Amino acid sequence: MGTLDGKVALVSGSGRGIGRAVVEKLAAEGARVVLNDLDKDVADEAAAQLRQAGAEVVACVGSVTDPEFPGRFVQAALDSFGRLDIIVNNAGYTWDNVIQKTSDEQWYAMLDVHLTAPFRILRASSDYIRSAAKAEAAAGTPVMRKVVNVSSVSGVLGNAGQIGYAAGKAGINGMTKTLAKEWGRYQVTVNSVGFGLIKTRLTEMVADAPGTIDIEGRQIRVGVNPELLAAIEPSIPLGRAGTPRDGAGAIYLLCIPESDYITGQVLLCTGGAPI
């Protein structure tokens, strides 16, 4: 038996990278999962591969910044699996600049994906969360539920050149603490995981060619210069950047029954940097 048998999870931004690793881990522990990606081909392929491995997974394609998406996402869990127990707000990307070079478009793009989208997903889930909790309490069978919001060490300490990203991630930490107070009565824990340097396609790039991703028609430069990576990694006490599996492990810890009395916290997953 898995630690999450019978649970149903939503994981946004989960076709690749940390999100994909989260889906794999939750499914391996018995959860049924609705995964999400902006790219239909990526989402469908990920879902097919996971189902082939024995997971119960469905895909919900769409942009988390679309105001209509959160309702579809929550409904996908209820229609496919009949319940909702875990919400992981993972979708995001970096679009970095110093303040004097940051346009309004760039600023709002970072707030939309890192703060507004999680807010809307959680708001869309609130009717189900509250009604289910009340019914379970009345029946004498309370059920713990979990929300994990993906943040960053940049949202805790700030980071030069990431004015919009850091603001969005700081905001999600504030929302986490507030919702922990609002939803505690419904037996829901709400926590954030603040990542440090995790190697994904968003942080890696070819030495001679900056990487880009297409976000709703915008070509966004991503990646960390390999020379900078080489300088950063020795400063991490564990001596290396994290992996998607490392990130998934931190999120998983906040989804299991052993963390039922932990709420309103920001867990840093940074390999010890900074201490």
Give a label for each model feature.
Residues 2-34:
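Canonical Rossmann dinucleotide-binding motif of NAD(H)/NADP(H)-dependent dehydrogenases/reductases
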Residues 98-99, 103-111, 232:
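Substrate-binding pocket helix/loop in short-chain dehydrogenase/reductase
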Residues 122, 168, 176:
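Active-site helix of classical SDR
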Residues 127, 181-182, 260:
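Alpha-helical segment proximal to the catalytic Tyr-Lys
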Residues 152:
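Residue(s) in the substrate-gating loop at a strand-loop-helix junction
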Residues 157, 250-252, 263-275:
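Short C-terminal tail/terminal secondary-structure segment
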Residues 184, 189, 262-264:
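Short, small/polar-rich loop/turn modules that mediate ligand/substrate recognition or access, typified
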